[in-house]
Amino acid sequence: METGTAPLVAPPRRHGAPAAPSPPPRGSRAGPVVVVAPGPPVTTATSAPVTLVAPGEARPAWVPGSAETSAPAPAPAPAPAPAVTGSTVVVLTLEASPEAPKPQLPSGPESPEPAAVAGVETSRALAAGADSPKTEEARPSPAPGPGTPTGTPTRTPSRTAPGALTAKPPLAPKPGTTVASGVTARSASGQVTGGHGAAAATSASAGQAPEDPSGPGTGPSGTCEAPVAVVTVTPAPEPAENSQDLGSTSSLGPGISGPRGQAPDTLSYLDSVSLMSGTLESLADDVSSMGSDSEINGLALRKTDKYGFLGGSQYSGSLESSIPVDVARQRELKWLDMFSNWDKWLSRRFQKVKLRCRKGIPSSLRAKAWQYLSNSKELLEQNPGKFEELERAPGDPKWLDVIEKDLHRQFPFHEMFAARGGHGQQDLYRILKAYTIYRPDEGYCQAQAPVAAVLLMHMPAEQAFWCLVQICDKYLPGYYSAGLEAIQLDGEIFFALLRRASPLAHRHLRRQRIDPVLYMTEWFMCIFARTLPWASVLRVWDMFFCEGVKIIFRVALVLLRHTLGSVEKLRSCQGMYETMEQLRNLPQQCMQEDFLVHEVTNLPVTEALIERENAAQLKKWRETRGELQYRPSRRLHGSRAIHEERRRQQPPLGPSSSLLSLPGLKSRGSRAAGGAPSPPPPVRRASAGPAPGPVVTAEGLHPSLPSPTGNSTPLGSSKETRKQEKERQKQEKERQKQEKEREKERQKQEKEREKQEKEREKQEKERQKQEKKAQGRKLSLRRKADGPPGPHDGGDRPSAEARQDAYF
């Protein structure tokens, strides 16, 4: 049987028989005690003093009947070790028993006793009588009182404590294995582990065994039907002056014989258990993250995914599709090339940068890419030591209390923030406190904590702080200010855009009277860090740092369109409660990484459309609610807008070095700078020889070359001349302005004359029309007054006159 070290199998010993020395087998070495016993293991604890064997002096037990130990040679007795009273935790690991020769049971009254083993693995030890957390395996028993017999074993009820090492489930034994029942292994600290039917706790005082209340525990031998128990025994540490150091011993390596000092950035065992009990108890319900037996500070390690999550809704496991290694390396090389010429790529080839961000930034370069995209890297370089200064400054107590209460709520299933008081929560506290001092008008908003936590998962605290500053100032200005007016305004913008993207979802939400702030506040303010799976969160953040807030609008529109955008999906959302429940439990398909990125990139929502809706909603806001109480800075849409603003804010270039090299300008420049004026150029005296040409005096150079021109008059003009020139330019601008005003007035008068002329023509036409109508009426009246022409005039007789002639 191989367990990493040579196994030691102890033969049974009858009750009351003295211990006899056992010869060690050839080639054996110290290792864990192996107890072969059928049935479930029983763990008991005792506080009686036991005999410890120093390392290198142990005599391992021998297997009776084996070929190597058939004729054992006598071995020298080990030197007695000092008796130590204490209690330890005994770890049981159940393994299947391999093929082994059947042990021979001694028939005599005496049987050899298994010797103590040196060099066993060190585990966490607790002082005798000290309080300890409950454990499933063994709880330290209190020191024996004056009325308690020393040799009486005490059984302790057990419960589970966070971080306790538990026994593995038993494995099926191999057929044909023979064991002996009732075998008992004695630990160096006084704990006794016995098999089924053996319940005696042994004492190492004078080689005598105490009275066994359960009687002899020797059982029959035969074929093994139980697993083999590998017992790892840990001696209690030696008494020290400071008993508090007992909680800081580590269990990360075998052979550690004494207590070690506590690391400055770690917690003691008791502190770790008391601080993390709530977190680990909640983690114990999630079986997807189980599977690690190693320990750190006494707490069992758990398997994490590649992002560091122990469990929870954002635990990804091994179901995600990974990018091929060669493709990942090619992408890394492309990003490194962009970093070397970042300004050129942003100004000239921004579309390529945007395409690569949509494909996903390599994990190894994501932190650096986010800093370049947000321009926080340059902000960090411009403010060296600013973060440390803010960290040392005293903060506002009202903000610090709220920040401290929110620390344990940020990603409790992530390995960085699982431990209360761990380095992750400490860095998060430093960042949020520094921001409240850096922006005292805004203070602290609870939605800033998850954003800062995501940044801390990728970069150090100082870099994460400046990246958070850029997010709050450039990408999402006003989101975290008092009153949350910016997020309310963006909610109205989002609802207007939803009418274009999904009219059915817009109509349903309006019918149910669900305000956008009820469901989109956490999405927008946390940038979906608490909503989407973690792989999708990182892809959304990659695009967000490159393209700005339009990515947040697009993601929210995609989620609503695929949640409430069809008649079938609305059948289960008949009321407000059902709709809100559906929005809290989004479909997994629409949150999947590739599907979400594809839908987001194809949604036609641009910066111009968002700004147009922003202007419309801002006008409506002012009409209904008045002016905004908080007026943030202008929102910048992505890294290119931030880059262009940075170029505009750069100071103009200074004068040319060729002008500064001239004496006159050098003198004025030094006087303007507050320094002593440079001496005037020396006056050359006339001589018989030809006069040398003027020289040019440059900074840091001796005059050696002749000037190409003979004029050494310094360039520029006096202050009065410049003032007159400015006055003349001002008057010229005023004259041009007056000329333009006169021209406008002349054009206005001309238009007025044309208008009057047209009006006059219109009136003339109307007058002529009226005159023509009047002439027509006069003519018709004259004709009526004159009557028709008579017969003598060639006309017809009137009908009345003809009728009168006919009557008479």
Swiss-Prot record:
This is TBC1 domain family member 10B. It is found in: Cytoplasm; Cell membrane. Its main location: cytoplasm. GO terms for biological process: regulation of GTPase activity; retrograde transport, endosome to Golgi. Residues 100-112 have a biased composition (Pro residues). Acts as a GTPase-activating protein for RAB3A, RAB22A, RAB27A, and RAB35. Does not act on RAB2A and RAB6A. Residues 179-189, 242-252, 707-718 have a biased composition (Polar residues). GO terms for molecular function: GTPase activator activity. Residues 719-774, 793-808 have a biased composition (Basic and acidic residues). The modification Omega-N-methylarginine is found at R186. SUPFAM superfamilies: Ypt/Rab-GAP domain of gyp1p. Residues 716-782 form a coiled coil. The keyword rRNA processing does not apply. GO terms for cellular component: cytosol; plasma membrane. The gene is TBC1D10B. It comes from Homo sapiens. It holds the Pfam family RabGAP-TBC.
